[in-house]
């Protein structure tokens, strides 16, 4: 099994705010991606008002250490999300191709 960890976030965006959220994520993502232990960061639009992200870290410790930086990175989009529009799951990477 890998020692890498991944974080998956589902963002449900308020009606009419999708472009603003995408712009904010594009602005903030490079800074977060450059943090120690962050191996990759991807965002995809998965619905009319939904974006999902996947961040892969070199370890669960790196995922946990970068938690405050993730909160800071996402602070600019939280007000643009629908009520209950942020759902996060984390886990250990078990298959990598």
Regions found by a protein language model. Name each.
Residues 1-6, 10-12, 38-52, 75-97:
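Glycine-rich beta-strand-turn "strand-cap" elements at beta-sheet edges
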């Amino acid at each position: 099994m890998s020692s890498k960890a991944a974080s998956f976030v589902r963002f449900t965006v308020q009606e009419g705010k999708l472009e603003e959220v995408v712009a904010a994520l594009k602005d903030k993502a490079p800074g977060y991606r450059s943090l120690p232990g962050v191996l990759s960061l991807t965002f995809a639009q998965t619905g009319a008002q939904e974006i999902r992200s996947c961040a892969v870290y070199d370890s669960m410790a790196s995922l946990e250490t970068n938690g405050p930086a993730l909160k800071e990175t996402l602070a600019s989009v939280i007000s643009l999300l629908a009520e209950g529009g942020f759902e996060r799951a984390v886990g250990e990477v078990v298959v990598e191709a």
